[in-house]
Amino acid sequence: MKITRKAATQRRHRRIRRKVFGTPERPRLAVFRSHRHIYAQVIDDVAQHTLVSASTLDRELREAFKDIGTATREAAAVVGRSVAQRALQAGICQVVFDRGGKLYHGRVQALAEAAREAGLQF
């Protein structure tokens, strides 16, 4: 039986999560991508607590998406910069990147590169 795209993504995500674990010193930057939006959270897996987050649904970022839309690489870069700035304000400078089972390509890659440029280390 052929594996569906969703099943392949879930399989990759389980494989990644076995290896990627966020600690208080180096939390996990988790990315979730849907067809219309992208979400990023910095998570402490020990305390099971989200430290900072950003998404294309944030009220503060909505003005940036008026012209570019929410399902673009540019929107993902805005979210990446935003989550990096919020993490740095919270005193977090190093994270572990969790691409959420998605391929490191397109919007996921744009978010990661923007977060790196904004000062997060991973």
From Swiss-Prot:
GO BP field: translation
Any one Gene Ontology molecular-function term assigned to this protein's record: 5S rRNA binding
Cross-referenced InterPro entries: Ribosomal_uL18_bac-type, Ribosomal_uL18_bac/euk
Record keyword Thylakoid present: no
Keyword Ribonucleoprotein: yes
GO CC, any one term: cytosolic large ribosomal subunit
Coiled coil: none
UniProt keyword list: Ribonucleoprotein, Ribosomal protein, RNA-binding, rRNA-binding
NCBIfam families: L18_bact
Subunit structure: Part of the 50S ribosomal subunit; part of the 5S rRNA/L5/L18/L25 subcomplex. Contacts the 5S and 23S rRNAs.
Function text: This is one of the proteins that bind and probably mediate the attachment of the 5S RNA into the large ribosomal subunit, where it forms part of the central protuberance.
Family from the record: Belongs to the universal ribosomal protein uL18 family.
Protein name, entry field: Large ribosomal subunit protein uL18
